[in-house]
Amino acid sequence: MALAQRQVSCRIERSTGASTSQPVGSCLLVQRRPGQRRGVPARATPEFIDALSALVPNLPLEQIAAPCQVMKCGDIVYRSTLDPSLYNEAGFDEKTVALLAPVLAYLFLPPGVLPGAIDYYIRAPLKRKQTKAIDKNDIVLGKRLGTGGFGTVFKGELKEEGGVKTSIIIKKAKEFGEAEVWMNERMSRVAGHHVAEFVTAFDESLNVPLPAAAGKRAAPVQPTSPLDANSIWLVWVYEGDNTLSSLMERREWPYNLEPLLFGRELRAPRGPVRELVTIKEAFRQLVQAVAACHSVGIVHRDIKPANCIVSERDKKIKLIDLGAAADLRIGINYVPNEYLLDPRYAPPQQYIMSTQTPKPPPKPVAAFLSPILWTMEKPDRFDMYSCGITLLQMVFGHLRNDNALIAFNKRLQELKWDLPAWRREEEAKLPSAKGALAESLEAGFEALDADGGAGWDLLMRLLAYKPTDRPSAAAVLAHPWLTSAPGRTASLQHSLSGSFEATVSTAAAATSTALTAAGKSLGQAAKDAGLASMEEAILKVNQGALTEAQLMEELGLQEPAPVAPREGSQTIAWWQERQNELKARLVERREAMSESDPYGAAPSAMQVGSAINNARGGKGAKPTTPVKPTGPMAAAGAAAAAAAAAARVEAKVKVPNILGVKKPASGGGSNGRANGNGNGKAAPAKAANGNGSGNGNTNGNGNGAKQQLFGGLLGRKQQPVEEVQEEPEEEVEPEQETASKKERAFNLLGVFRR
């Protein structure tokens, strides 16, 4: 208790009578009890002073000092001239930059983690909302352009609001359609000018009928077989009919490519220099398109001249047919031990990455690890080999034949992909070679030897056996053969003044025939060398039947490559989500079309009723407003209608055709209380040919004003009347009758379309 009442105070005061040895300002510790006299204060020890000095700055008390000393304001006007240590500001931190630089570099390495995330989470949803929702009811199919291993291609028209028609290309994909949609949509967002312009895609389940007013513009695209129920329809803007393959088959190659790439023919004289200019530009644009795919992590896997469209609108080469492509950023359309390729253009490895590569993990993880996998496996080198074969066909005319290309691949395999050895063999054949074969070899080697042999060096690199020995697309674009001006070497200039230029021009007319003969001979030699199975596979490719089983047979594989299950794949999940969103927007578009009626006035109720009744054989028409003919001869039509109405009162009583008037195409026991045909000469009520079996309103055809009704004309001019004998109707089987009704219905719908 005494201790609790004890008060402790510390007083720091200046000693008045202290000696000079005593420090100024000492701390005196005074202990005093109540009622006790003040004693002599004891002085504090140095340890106690140090403890207080450390405690005071940490107390939650406002500091008392000059403003600038507390705020560290320094010289505000000339602050940049001060030493950073004076106002306690950190300068350039090299360590932080050294740590962040590799991270940022990694995020931008191919295939691009950060750009891919922005595209997937931001650009893709926005682009999808901006894309117009269409289905098969908006498309009119045209002629079939061809059939490939992954589907059938048609030309057609897309009819939009306002009657605007757009020429389009439609592909009905039999397999890998979802993956091709993914590739086209992604490429259209990040590098749309390097691929054919993609419009949209839909499957058979997406079918929202057009409003009644718009139903007359287009015939729905109907599936032709039960297998079409799973088909996916892909739509592109029409870019043109010319591919590199179709152009190379003509004897005018490469001069026929000049107007498509440059907008006109080059003014230089025809010869190797001019040809090399066009070939270089075409190959440069092809590699640029391939580089655009690789920059976003897409490997095409089917690079060949047939998949290089020459756009008439943009004057450049674009890639098409992305059905075999793989998006290695997140693993879309990629299975480690599955291959998709054309054996004529594929590298010897057949796979874009090792078969031991694990299956793609979830999308975020796969995207983050994609630069490591891309750097280790170099999957883009698969496409570079295909580019090398394409370049080979550009410069060597005889290799544009399938049989010759097969023989080349076989011989290159026997030589263990030693391209210089193949060249030595071909050059040894030159003295004995004749015609187009000799011209092709001479022209090809001379073009590749131009510019110091830069073209030959590039070709050897592209056709290297090891993927790591092949250059990337960016390295090819920086190669001297594409960066230097063509024809600068003395050897090529010397060839211009030689006999080669004249030989090329004189042999152009016979090139096609000679190539065909050479292809047949090489094809026979290939068969003798054991290439019959490969030739059969190539023929099936040309017929559009390249399947996994055929590739297995051609490549000599024993076990089929497993296919990813459709139900569990990321591609199918993405496709189903896309279809649900597309259908919702399509319903909104159809509702807007029905409200605004942008296609013009709908056909009249009389016309629609007549069309349906004629298709059904005159059954089930609802009463509609009658069409009254006008003109000086309209009385005959009215009288005929009245007579037919009277005939209808008596059940199934036929009025004889006393006037001998020919029945129109739209008559014959169909709609209307009457289909009376008066010729204007007889006013009596019996002058009619009415058929009261119908249950619609009057369709009296008098010689009045001109009215167009499903092709029938009610003209002012009186037509010559011929007596026609009525033939008894044949009994039709129920199935034939149903087919006949459907045929009449589609014919009538065709009138709406016109």
Curated annotation (Swiss-Prot):
Residues 139-482 form the Protein kinase domain. It is an enzyme of class 2 (transferase). It comes from the Eukaryota. The active site is at 302 (proton acceptor). GO terms for cellular component: chloroplast thylakoid membrane. It catalyses: L-seryl-[protein] + ATP = O-phospho-L-seryl-[protein] + ADP + H(+); L-threonyl-[protein] + ATP = O-phospho-L-threonyl-[protein] + ADP + H(+). Its EC number is 2.7.11.1. Residues 660-746 are annotated as: Disordered. GO terms for molecular function: ATP binding; protein serine kinase activity; protein serine/threonine kinase activity. The keyword Zinc does not apply. It is found in: Plastid, Chloroplast thylakoid membrane. Residues 680-690 have a biased composition (Low complexity). Residues 723-736 have a biased composition (Acidic residues). Its main location: plastid. ATP binds at residues 145-153, 172. Keywords: ATP-binding, Chloroplast, Kinase, Membrane, Nucleotide-binding, Plastid, Serine/threonine-protein kinase, Thylakoid, Transferase, Transit peptide. Residues 666-679, 691-703 have a biased composition (Gly residues). Serine/threonine protein kinase required for state transition by phosphorylating light-harvesting complex II outer antennae (LCHII). State transition plays a central role in response to environmental changes and allows to adjust to changing light conditions via the redistribution of light excitation energy between photosystem II (PSII) and photosystem I (PSI). This is Serine/threonine-protein kinase stt7, chloroplastic.
